[in-house]
A protein has these predicted regions:
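Acidic catalytic/metal-coordinating carboxylates
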Residues: 42-45, 68-71
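Active-site beta3 strand of CheY-like receiver
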Residues: 53-59
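Short, flexible helix-to-coil linker/hinge segments that flank and couple to helix-turn-helix
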Residues: 96-101, 107, 112-160, 168
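Active-site residues of response regulator receiver
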Residues: 15, 61, 89
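Receiver (REC) domain active-site loop signature in two-component systems and cognate sites
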Residues: 64
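Helix-turn-helix DNA-binding segment
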Residues: 152-187
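Short hydrophobic/Thr-rich beta-strand motif most characteristic of the beta2 strand and flanking loop
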Residues: 33-41, 49
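Conserved acidic segment of CheY-like receiver
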Residues: 7-20, 24-28, 58, 162
Length: 187
């Protein structure tokens, strides 16, 4: 959480597309509680910048030359664990979302996200650690289901062998006999 509510959230944007960086900065320029303090065009450049200035939030592109966002993410989290990282991409790939969250990302947004969504993600990551949207929710739930679709051995249904009496009771139940009728037939 921010120490002072009056201090703007300091943001670095790392993306190899100059126009995208400029567009995000322009779209959020009216937000007085967000201040862009630097920008980088690749992961290596970003690591160099971080030696001089550490932001509250990094908007990090996944696909960049020299060092990708995927490669630089764990390095940033190791060196600067308090920095919140919002991954930006054109990809809406569930397995990618899960991988990035496991590497330490605090949110995942597609580049076609509205500027208000980006703003909300920045604020929420600072205030609450993570920002989840439909993309992240679906991806994480899908991955969780896939990981837990395997039934543990001790819970797996074992082959059940019924004795003659149990088989008769089951057959009578299927024939919709009453409990009294079943009891009379079995005894």
């Amino acid at each position: 959480m921010k120490q002072e509510n009056s201090d703007p959230i300091q943001v670095i944007i790392a993306d190899d597309h100059v126009l995208f960086r400029a567009g995000v900065k322009t779209a959020l320029s009216s937000k007085k509680d967000v201040k862009f303090i630097a920008e980088a065009d690749n992961g290596m450049h970003l690591l160099t910048l971080l030696k001089a200035v550490v932001p509250d939030v990094i908007l990090l592109d996944i696909e960049m030359p020299i060092m990708t966002g995927i490669n630089v993410l764990p390095e940033i989290k190791k060196l600067y664990p308090s920095v919140k990282i919002i991954m930006l991409t054109m990809l809406n790939d569930h397995s990618m979302v899960t991988q990035l969250m496991e590497l330490g990302a605090n949110s995942y947004l597609t580049k076609d996200s509205d500027s208000e969504v980006i703003y909300e993600a920045i604020k929420t990551c600072v205030e609450q650690e993570y920002f989840f949207n439909d993309i992240t929710n679906k991806a994480l739930l899908t991955n969780l289901k896939e990981k837990h679709n395997v039934v543990p051995q001790h819970l797996a249904a074992a082959e059940v062998v019924l004795n003659e009496k149990e088989t008769t009771i089951l057959r009578l139940m299927c024939e919709e006999k009453s409990t009294k009728e079943i009891a009379d037939i079995v005894d």
